[in-house]
Amino acid sequence: CVTYIYVGTPIERPGAQPQLQLGDRMVDVSQLSALVAAERSRMTPAEQQRHLVVIKADRHIPMSLLRQVKDALRRAHATRIIYTANDKKR
């Protein structure tokens, strides 16, 4: 089971604050822990062991935001994380 989180500024609003997208919806970092925990609760114990979170982030977002995301995932017991970064044209 894989959960995808996208972090970056919206394409249609360059210069705006970075936002989080969990699956197909926009979420606030304060909601992330509860949403991921709810997703994990629907999994079997075997699936929870294999659960992987992929964070795809804009290379230019603040590291403090990624730290908040990582802390939220830790609270949801989602500790298998892969980070990828992309260079958006500014």
Q: PLM features: residue spans?
A:
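Long, low-hydrophobicity, acidic/polar, solvent-exposed interaction domains
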Residues: 1-90
